[in-house]
Amino acid sequence: GYGEVGRILAEDLRAQGVAVAAWDLKLASPASAAPLHDHAGRQGVVLAASAADLAAGSDLVVSAVTASQAVPVAADCASAIRPGAFFLDFNSASPGAKQRAAALVDGAGGRYVEGAVMTSIPPYRIRVPLLLGGSSAARLAPLLNALGFDAKMASERLGVASATKMCRSVIIKGLEAM
């Protein structure tokens, strides 16, 4: 997605000279696409025609979409993902959705990694604390950190990173409510 999270990551990666492409459902509607085109033009981001086109040309796909779109986007990306390319799933989807997305991506030759964003992105931007999970997480963490991310390995098991995030959220929100 090329919403708030996607645009922030694109800005920070482009500031380092990293080539960035993006795709978003909103690109299908001229009215909602205009601000995305404006931002992409200012940042030097290439807008892809589809999620599959984006995946076909990428070594790393960061999926930051709504929970309802997590599996459909993973399926679209899996249809064209490069062998060995990473698919980093930032989505707040259910464990079952994460497992379905992982099966699609890994089954197509990609490397699915669960990414749990541990706090709000805007104040931290690319340095937001991330917990990674999955069998390819240990290989992706140093690559992300070299790009400026603050990524740490949680577990090779899918779901541990997201469960840790959920537990943290329950505690923090509970304390804030007191």
Model-predicted regions and their roles:
Residues 93-170:
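Rossmann-fold dinucleotide-binding core
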Residues 51-112:
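Rossmann-fold NAD(P) dinucleotide-binding segment
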Residues 168-178:
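Short, intrinsically disordered, charge-balanced linker/junction segments flanking boundaries
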Residues 17, 57-58, 84, 128, ...:
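Short, well-ordered alpha-helix to beta-strand connector turns
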